[in-house]
Amino acid sequence: MHFIYRVVLVLAAFALFKVDSISAGVTFNEEHLTIPRFTRPVEENLIKRQLRVMDDNERGFPSGPSLEKIEAMFQSLTNKITTKSKPSQRDVPDEKLSQLLGAAKPVNKAVEAAGRLKTLQTQKWLDEGKSTQEVFQLLELNKFMVPNFKKIEGTVFGLPDFNTWVNYVDDFNAKNPTKKESMIPTLRTIYSDEGLTRALELAKTYSTTNALATKLRKEQIQRWLDDAQTPKYVFEMFMIDDKVDGLLTNPRFIAWTKYVDDFNLQYPTSRASMEPPIAAHYGDDAVFAMLEAAKKVQLTENVASRLQAEQIKRLLNSNRSPEYVFEAFNLHETGDNLLSTPMFKTWFNYLESFNKKNTDKETLLAPIHRYYHDHGVAKIVAEGMKNPSTVELSKQLQIQRYKRWLHAERPPRDAFNTFILEKPGADVIIRYNERLDGKLYQVRLNKVSDGLLSSPEFQLWSKYLDDWNTKYPDQKQSMAKIFQALFTEDALAKMIMAARNNPSTQKIASLLENAFAKV
């Protein structure tokens, strides 16, 4: 093939020399003529290697002058031209323009001659029955530069001789219909699966290579299927750089789902689910957030629901803890209205399924308390009590919270602060003063919240006090002493007076009044 290049260089040099002589008397503008240079690296041993004479070998052309001499001559001629300005058409007389156009004809003829020589050469290879991979190497397409997937010129698709090879493959397959060869195995000699995928995706963005790239992508997928490549492997190839947002409408994802269906049909004993590769690639939390958003869109609702069901099933089969799933579902960032969200209901169903499957039960409170802490749990309970559909869950959460305090040996006075005085929406402000020794003490409140003794929080705390005294008899605490430590005498007197007027609190008011008198 080097001989062809030499012929082109000689003819081009001759033509440029002729153009130079014709245009010598013309007035030029400031623009300069840029002469392209042959920059593709050629190995020294290939330059010096003599072409074999005409016989049954791969080349049929005698050797000619050295390429170095031709390039030197060509450079000398082009230097003469590039030192002059490029003429515009309006500055060139008609007769001169005609002469210039005529002088350019040899260049066109040189290109045409090179094309004919290349056609003759490829036809000779075809007659000899050379494989498509052999011709790929003869055209030196396997020696291109380091891949650059940002522009087509950085891939094999951007090399001039690539189209020659593509045409050869078509001609070879037309001549050998029973021995057709795919381009994919040859391209895989220079690219990994990932590299070829990137190159094909880039080629699909160019109108000149879109059709070929689309065809090759189909061949690549079929080869993966024939080789029993797992859907997980193919997913990694398809979604190399794609983000999880918009995944379900991504054309490559849609093509991948078809691959999964085809794989399961062809290999029924190795059936694969779509969800695991997605979760492995993006993570459970990102996938679940994406699926929740996709379920709200009619176009993707069905596939999102299907994938979410698969994800929950996989998590349950892998015995993932409810706490892990709680975070994976992004429930740790939901806020006070946690109990009323659809995702919490899904998680709660997971919790129940997990507890049926495992002897070591998980509580409703544990993951919520881990991320929201006690005060946050109190706010979630308060918000949940406002919604009829979540009242029972709120009560269940409050009871577990209460049991946690008791198990942790938190004294009733601390529980009173947490359950009543510091509850969300409380209308009192707790203040502290400092003693001489530097320790803080709580300042007694001069007001008791209205309806305190009839509130659910007080009833819960009262039960907590009884349970505490039963469980820790040597650490018994008195309700009257706790009240007197937290409230002023005037505040307690007003509380007792108001409680006497309420039939539901008359009994507790009487008990407290008697207890205050004994303290």
Swiss-Prot record:
Q: Where is this motif: RxLR-dEER?
A: 49-59
- Tell me which Pfam families the record gives: PexRD54_WY
Keywords attached to this Swiss-Prot or TrEMBL record, sorted alphabetically, are: Host cytoplasm, Secreted, Signal, Virulence
The stated induction of this gene product is: Expression is induced during host plant infection.
Which compartments does it reside in? Answer: Secreted; Host cytoplasm
Q: Which GO terms describe its cellular component?
A: extracellular region; host cell cytoplasm
Which InterPro entries does its entry note?
PexRD54_WY
What residue stretch is flagged as signal peptide? Answer: 1-24
Purpose: Effector that enhances P.infestans colonization of Nicotiana benthamiana leaves.
**Family designation:** Belongs to the RxLR effector family.
The free-text domain remark for this protein reads: The RxLR-dEER motif acts to carry the protein into the host cell cytoplasm through binding to cell surface phosphatidylinositol-3-phosphate.
Q: What is this protein called?
A: RxLR effector protein PITG_15278
Organism of origin is Phytophthora infestans (strain T30-4)
